[in-house]
Amino acid sequence: MKNTYNLRSIAAKAISQVLDQGQSLSTVLPGLQKSISDKDRALLQELCFGTLRVLPQLEWCIQQLMARPMTGKQRVFHYLIMVGLYQLIYTRIPPHAALAETVEGATALKRPQLKGLINGVLRQFQRQQVELLERAANNDSHYLHPSWLLARIKLAYPDQWQQILDANNQKPPMWLRVNRLHHSRIEYLELLKQANIEALPHDFYPDAVRLITPCAVSDLPGFELGWVTVQDASAQGCVDLLDPQDGEQILDLCAAPGGKTTHILEAAPKVHVLAVDIDEQRLSRVKENLQRLRLHADVRVGDGRTPDEWCGDQQFDRILLDAPCSATGVIRRHPDIKWLRRDSDIAELAQLQSEIIEAIWPKLKKGGVMVYATCSILPEENQQQIATFLQRHSEADLVETGTVSALGRQNLPHPEDGDGFYYAKLIKR
């Protein structure tokens, strides 16, 4: 049966909601995916994520092909053309099908009179494709990052910035966390092999497994039974550093969507975990993950800056603070971050992080452990944050994490490894 919807127009609307309304793809896509087939959901995701990943290149190409930009109510058609260009450059969709479906998107968006224009622009691109892409490769658009972020990455990593950009611009690997309550990693790797799913263990993180080719979670052995969770390898490092022990009181702050909460409980099933997040809607994901893995935690809504409101005078043996951050380490998973973030956000986020860590530190028992973590690669949110905290608190000791960074561990995104992530392990004397 022929679809009653046009996927390219849906993708253009999603991109408009990100770029013009400041919404994240993870917020926008679930609602749009409800009305389309399972098969088309994957393609919609590819069109949206892919277009946003290479946005500057597509924008530059359109500037060469059109005398005037499409603005105002016609802006969504600008994004429709982008979706068309993305298909022609980056997908295996036959060009005639990509063109036909994209042009038809104008009808779905109730402006059939623009079909001729869209068709003309895309066909002109086809004729000039080789030349345009060669020229695009020789200007700043080929970095595929906003100029402010490019400048910050170059400053922080003068010898590694190009590798970081390259990793950010690639599709992310799919990492799993094996639930040690059900199987050892070796046992689960054998189950994957039996299911004809190629996978490799991580060299450093004991529960992490990388799939050679990403697959649907429904294809993973025992996913619904809680045998495994999809979680990046670097994110798994938080709980390895935290090292929870049975019988302890543990706080997981900024806990949503629950990957680290459940990892704590898999590592030490007899701990008591309080999982707190300011976003009530995202906390529902924590509950869903706990339910699938058949684990239990105390889940509460709360602001990290005001802990007395949600835990009173309770103190904890260990605290995991996965602080709100710029998410510059996970751009390959969320390419919309590049266009939603602003340079001014970094100082604001650093201030918020400072307020949270100051407010929560008194809740850690003497002799207790706090792991401060972010999915950022920017020093202002990481090493500099911890350096100023240590200056303020003589009773805090930084534990050596065995890595390059003198103040904590800074992972950088890598095509065959984890995301960009930072951890610092602190002990209260």
Curated annotation (Swiss-Prot):
Record keyword Ribonucleoprotein present: no
Q: What is its EC number?
A: 2.1.1.176
The record's InterPro entries line, in alphabetical order, gives: MeTrfase_RsmB-F_NOP2_cat (IPR049560), MeTrfase_RsmB-F_NOP2_dom (IPR001678), NusB-like_sf (IPR035926), NusB_RsmB_TIM44 (IPR006027), RCMT (IPR023267), rRNA_ssu_MeTfrase_B (IPR004573), rRNA_ssu_MeTfrase_B_ent (IPR023541), RsmB-like_ferredoxin (IPR054728)
PROSITE patterns hit by this protein: NOL1_NOP2_SUN (PS01153), SAM_MT_RSMB_NOP (PS51686)
Which positions in this protein are listed as binding S-adenosyl-L-methionine? Answer: C254, A255, A256, P257, G258, G259, K260, D277, D303, D322
Q: Name one GO molecular function term.
A: RNA binding
Q: Does the record carry Protein biosynthesis as a key word?
A: no
Q: What keywords are assigned to this protein?
A: Cytoplasm, Methyltransferase, RNA-binding, rRNA processing, S-adenosyl-L-methionine, Transferase
Q: How would you classify this enzyme at the top EC level?
A: transferase
Where is it found, in Gene Ontology cellular component terms?
Answer: cytosol
Positions annotated as active site in the UniProt record:
C375 (nucleophile)
One Gene Ontology term of the biological-process aspect is: regulation of DNA-templated transcription
Q: Which reaction does it catalyse?
A: cytidine(967) in 16S rRNA + S-adenosyl-L-methionine = 5-methylcytidine(967) in 16S rRNA + S-adenosyl-L-homocysteine + H(+)
Q: Where are the transmembrane segments?
A: none
What's the main place this protein lives?
Answer: cytoplasm
Cellular localisation: Cytoplasm
| Entry similarity comment | Belongs to the class I-like SAM-binding methyltransferase superfamily. RsmB/NOP family.
Task of the protein = Specifically methylates the cytosine at position 967 (m5C967) of 16S rRNA.
What protein name is recorded for this chain?
A: Ribosomal RNA small subunit methyltransferase B
Species whose genome carries this gene: Yersinia enterocolitica serotype O:8 / biotype 1B (strain NCTC 13174 / 8081)
